[in-house]
Amino acid sequence: MKPYPIDLVSVVIPVYNEEASLPELLRRTEAACLELGRAFEIVLVDDGSRDRSAELLQAAAERDGSAVVAVILNRNYGQHAAILAGFEQSRGDLVITLDADLQNPPEEIPRLVERAAQGYDVVGSIRAERQDSAWRRWPSRLVNLAVQRSTGVAMHDYGCMLRAYRRSIVEAMLACRERSTFIPILANGFARHTCEIRVAHAERAHGESKYSAMRLLNLMFDLVTCMTTTPLRLLSLVGGGMALAGFLFALFLLVLRLAFGAAWAGNGLFVLFAVLFMFSGVQLLGMGLLGEYLGRMYSDVRARPRFFIERVVRATPSALPSALQRVGFTSSSSEPSTP
């Protein structure tokens, strides 16, 4: 593993209704990036916010000497689609993702850059002493366990988006055109050298989490069905096992009927109903799982864009930080863009 040269660091942050936390987020992220001793840019992606987040991002990008790039999506597409939109607009040799809620402190960014410079393709993170409530922690643990078992990708904390990706890994992810994706797993599929570090975790200071219990459940379905066919194989094994169990149980009932007469068969009616309901439930579960896969195939075949960028606002060349100008990254002040 060889050291990886990093001249420009991009920090990509998806934003959805985070008006209250944005001023502190910008201040702390810029302060952390200034400690790097490298050129940097902060790419903030507004994912169809209903508050004033988009206005604040645009104002931040238009400041003199700002390193902020504001990417405004026309509506809400979801966290991972917003991150991919930020990837498209980023230019760094190393791209770091960070949530806007400040639960993962931006002050951890220099540690990620340090490990990535050692030659790692992907640097993940594990939330130490997680500060979320129990109803948030337990579903997250179930999601982590289910994904680890089904995908075989060994990661400890899929829900922590504070991660660093080498530029080549980002380009590989952008080349994938499937509609449903999960960035940490996708990145690990392309990475040769990966590592994880423990990072601090704080309570959410502003607003509420955008992930409800139902959204976590939907996320688990997305993870399992868009990244692996293991559930289909497991369903085949379960179906075969239940068919064998049903045959053996029917044979057992036949023997009992012959041995004890028809009266006993009448008493076993409720057992038969219970077995029938069990088999019907498994069949319906299998049909639902197949429907998930077919639905995702249909979405991929239509090949619609994963997101639509309404506008991108960057600093003018004269307003760019001197470090950015030295490496030659300049652009116009505002540019409409489509994926």
From Swiss-Prot:
Gene Ontology biological-process annotations: 4-amino-4-deoxy-alpha-L-arabinopyranosyl undecaprenyl phosphate biosynthetic process; lipid A biosynthetic process; lipopolysaccharide biosynthetic process; response to antibiotic
UniProt keyword Cell membrane present: yes
Pathway participation: Glycolipid biosynthesis; 4-amino-4-deoxy-alpha-L-arabinose undecaprenyl phosphate biosynthesis; 4-amino-4-deoxy-alpha-L-arabinose undecaprenyl phosphate from UDP-4-deoxy-4-formamido-beta-L-arabinose and undecaprenyl phosphate: step 1/2; Bacterial outer membrane biogenesis; lipopolysaccharide biosynthesis
Coiled-coil residue windows: none
InterPro entries per record: ArnC_tfrase, Glyco_trans_2-like, Glycosyltransferase_2, Nucleotide-diphossugar_trans
GO molecular function: phosphotransferase activity, for other substituted phosphate groups; undecaprenyl-phosphate 4-deoxy-4-formamido-L-arabinose transferase activity
Its EC number(s): 2.4.2.53
Membrane topology field: Multi-pass membrane protein
Pfam families: Glycos_transf_2
Reaction(s) the record says it catalyses: UDP-4-deoxy-4-formamido-beta-L-arabinose + di-trans,octa-cis-undecaprenyl phosphate = 4-deoxy-4-formamido-alpha-L-arabinopyranosyl di-trans,octa-cis-undecaprenyl phosphate + UDP
Membrane-spanning segments: 235-255, 269-289
Domain of life: Bacteria
Recorded GO CC terms: plasma membrane
Location(s) in or outside the cell: Cell inner membrane
Entry function: Catalyzes the transfer of 4-deoxy-4-formamido-L-arabinose from UDP to undecaprenyl phosphate. The modified arabinose is attached to lipid A and is required for resistance to polymyxin and cationic antimicrobial peptides.
Family: Belongs to the glycosyltransferase 2 family.
Protein name: Undecaprenyl-phosphate 4-deoxy-4-formamido-L-arabinose transferase
Organism, scientific name: Pseudomonas aeruginosa (strain UCBPP-PA14)
